[in-house]
Structure formats: C-alpha cells, structure tokens
C-alpha cells in the first residue's frame, strides 16, 4: 500500500532519515515469475489483446524481523562505476540503518582488564548508593570479579581515576611501566586533602556570606558559587587573577587547598605535585611521602585523634588503620569511601572502593540475542533443529545441561529434550498432533541420532539390531524391519528356521 512505499524515492530506494521497523521496505524490487507454456486458447487471447502484464513477485529488500532504526546512509553501486560487482548484477544498493539504545539488563560491558560482565539490573538514580556529599555512583561491580581473575589493575585504575578527577590531571600509565602503588597512594592522599579543603571552604564561605549580608541564599545557584565568591574575596589582594578564578573550578580548588594547608601549618610547596610543578624525578619520592604523612595527620585530627609523626611511614599506616577500625572511617590512602544505601540512607557496614574507571559497552546486546522458536527448520543429516538466531534455530541442550536434569531426577523432561523436542521425527509429529487435537501424548520413538550411529557402525561392517522391552527385534537394513521374536528361549536363532 501507499503507507509501505511513502518513504521511497522515484527509484524505489528509501530516503535518508526515514524511520523503519520490521518488514519495512528499504529498496522496492519486483521479479517476473517464470513464463509457463501457454495453452492454444491463451496464445489466441494474447494475440488478440496484446502482451498482458506478466505475473511478478515482490522481492523487495526489507528490514529483518525484530529490527528498527533510522536510515543514515544509502549507497548505490552501478557496473559503470564498480567493475567488481558480481556476475549478473547491474546495480547494487546498500542501506545503512542506525539505532540508539540504552543499556538494559542482559547487555555486556567490559573494562580494560578483561573484567567483562553482564548488566543484571538497571535502577533509578535515586536508588543507587551515594557518597557522603550526595553524589550517586554510576555502576556497581561485583567484588568477586577480582580475586578469581587476579587482575588488580582494575582496582588501581579506579584509585588513580578518583585522584585524577579530584586533582584535575590526566594519568598516562603504560602497561607494566605505569604508576606504582606508592605513587597512587600519594595521589589518593592529595585527592583527600583537596576534597577536604573544598568542603571546609564551603563551610567558611556560608559563614562569611551570613556575616557580610551581601548575598541571600536565594541569589546563589549552589555551594560552588558560594565558594567561588568567598575565594575571590579572600584572594583579591594576593595577586591572583580573580576573573580567571571565577571561571576555572580547578584553579579555585587548588587555591582552596593551598589556603587550607597553610592554615593547618603545612607548606603546600612540599606536598602538592601538579603536572605544571615540574618536580625533579629524584625528589618525587620524598614529596609523595610528605603528602601521605600530612594526609594521615590531618585525617586523624579531623576525627579528634592524634598520630605520632616521628614514627616511620609503615608504623604511621598501622596507627591510621587502628583509627579506621575504631571509628569506621576509611583511611584516605586506601581508596575507599563511606557509601550510603540509596533507599534507606543508612551507611553500609564496610567502606567501599569508589573511583573512576573506563567501562565500555560491548557489541553483544541482549536485544540482538533474544530469540524464541516454536517449530522451525531441521538439519537434513541429524534431523535436529538448526542452531542460532539467524537460522531460526533451537537452543542447544548440551551434555552439561543433561547432567543438570539428571541431577534433578527430571526423567520425563529429559526424555522430551532428547526425543520429541529434538530428532525423533515420527514422535515430534505425533506429539504436535496430540497437542493440537487435545489427546494424550504417546511414548516417544527412536531418535534419528541413533539411526545415524547405526549407519556409521554398518559402514564399519557391524550389523546392529535393537531388542525392545516387549521382545520385538528391530534390524536396520535398507528398510528398517520389525518382527516378533518367535523363539524367546534362545536355543535357536529364529531367522534361520528350526
């Protein structure tokens, strides 16, 4: 009808931008049916009335079943321009259809460490676990994916990603020659300090705004704007470009960190390590250790605890871990955060590793893989259903699946799987008829796979016969032969007479 061809141009090719669904025509095409021998009467009628329009069949290119999308490209290849077209092809049309999909349960995703997995659930953002500052996490990975594969790289990437996002740098770590665990620990320490400084600056900003009465809370967009106004006021006479500060969040965070460290009695130049600082390689290790020590000291102070800074770094770490066990607050340098349940708002009983990781969507989408079959094509050799979605095939019920049914003791289900649902040709037809006519299903027969096995054995020169429960013998020759066993005593072979 007109609806089916409304998006086709004068050549019968679909236009770019058209929305298409299952069975939509992409390229209109008709093929004449084979000319049959005409009767004398038909020849007379054709001679009188002229050549009638011959019978044609519709052979249009259509969208496959279950597919949809928008046409993004159409290419037409002709023999004049493309001499490498197949023999007998004058014109070829290639239509590209694209579709946008959201991630859904069953889609496959993977990181860069072989940590692939399948999405098990997609939930509203308000139900996702969230950090203390209210930010929800994007994706939750099962921790069992780490000890089994022992790919610790994904944890280190998460830690370094968190530090890089907090401090505003880009990490480039070649395989086997990237950041060491000590360097990542130092960056996590600096990340905690800049985040803590930003939090403290926010508290001070609101106190200052409250005292000067220059702004009302309604005038400000959020905490971020309050911090920037406060920093611009405090740093106005220090030679810093206030205009640049207001437009550059990263610069503002770094200035807040420097201010906070000075207020706490530390020299920022001995702790921070931003890319533009160009710290010599020989001094980086000492700079990193100072950063870790300062972080642990400031973290302990924020919890009302004291650390002895004269201890070695290893002893300092152990003391910090003891504080963590007492208070339930994770040490900043281990890369874990306090998470809260999205539904209840309660803290989880253990700190959780949170960070930034590259995660990719693989080209194994559940929408392409979902498939169902009632009856369909069968293999000519085995008489079993074909395999795969493309052939409209069945699901393979393999050896291990058979073990599972055996373990459950599901004898009748297993018998069905191996006979009428598979390659018992007579049995599946009889079962179908019984279901349609609402009659009892008969006992299954012999699977075709057994007959194939018998033929293989016969090719080796081995004669095979089946003896049924009722004593009936089935021999497999050119035509399968059924007969009664007349002498069940076994004294004489009934085939050769008495």
Name each model-derived stretch.
Residues 1-498:
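Long insertion/accessory domains within large nucleic-acid-processing enzymes
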């Amino acid at each position: 009808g007109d609806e089916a061809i409304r998006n086709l141009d004068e050549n019968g090719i679909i236009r770019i931008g058209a929305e298409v669904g299952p069975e939509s025509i992409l390229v209109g095409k008709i093929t004449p049916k084979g000319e049959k021998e005409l009767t004398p009467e038909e020849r007379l009628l054709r001679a009188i009335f002229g050549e009638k329009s011959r019978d044609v069949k519709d052979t249009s290119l259509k969208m496959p079943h279950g597919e949809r999308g928008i046409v993004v490209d159409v290419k037409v290849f002709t023999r004049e321009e493309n001499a490498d077209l197949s023999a007998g092809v004058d014109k070829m049309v290639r239509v590209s259809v694209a579709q946008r999909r959201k991630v859904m349960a069953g889609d496959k995703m993977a990181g860069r460490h072989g940590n692939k997995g399948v999405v098990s659930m997609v939930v509203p953002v308000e139900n996702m676990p969230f950090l203390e500052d209210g930010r929800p996490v994007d994706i939750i990975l099962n921790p069992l994916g780490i000890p089994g594969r022992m790919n610790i790289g994904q944890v280190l990437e998460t830690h370094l990603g968190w530090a890089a996002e907090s401090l505003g740098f880009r990490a480039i770590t070649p395989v086997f020659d990237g950041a060491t665990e000590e360097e990542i620990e130092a960056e996590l320490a600096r990340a905690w300090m800049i985040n803590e400084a930003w939090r403290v600056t926010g508290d001070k900003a609101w106190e200052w705004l409250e005292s000067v009465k220059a702004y009302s809370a309604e005038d400000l967009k959020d905490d971020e704007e309050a911090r920037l106004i406060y920093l611009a006021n405090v740093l106005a006479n220090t030679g810093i470009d206030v205009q640049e500060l207001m437009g550059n969040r990263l610069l503002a965070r770094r200035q807040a960190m420097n201010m906070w460290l000075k207020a706490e009695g530390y020299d920022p130049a001995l702790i921070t390590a931003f890319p533009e600082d160009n710290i010599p390689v020989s001094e980086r290790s000492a700079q990193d250790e100072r950063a870790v020590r300062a972080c642990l000291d400031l973290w302990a102070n924020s919890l009302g605890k004291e650390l002895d800074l004269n201890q070695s770094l290893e002893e300092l770490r152990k003391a910090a871990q003891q504080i963590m066990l007492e208070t339930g607050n994770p040490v900043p340098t281990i890369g874990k955060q306090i998470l809260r349940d999205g539904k209840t708002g309660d803290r989880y009983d253990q700190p959780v590793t949170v960070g930034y990781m590259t995660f990719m969507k693989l080209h194994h989408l559940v929408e392409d893989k979902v498939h169902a079959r009632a009856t369909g094509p069968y293999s000519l050799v085995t008489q079993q259903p074909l395999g795969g979605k493309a052939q409209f095939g069945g699901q393979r019920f393999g050896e291990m699946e058979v073990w599972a049914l055996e373990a459950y003791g599901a004898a009748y289900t297993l018998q069905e799987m191996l006979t009428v649902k598979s390659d018992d040709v007579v049995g599946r037809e009889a079962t179908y008829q019984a279901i349609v006519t609402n009659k009892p299903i008969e006992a299954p027969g012999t699977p075709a796979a057994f007959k194939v096995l018998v033929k293989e054995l016969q090719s080796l020169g081995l004669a095979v016969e089946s003896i049924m429960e009722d004593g009936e013998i089935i021999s497999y020759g050119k035509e399968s032969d059924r007969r009664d066993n007349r002498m069940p005593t076994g004294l004489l072979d009934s085939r050769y007479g008495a």
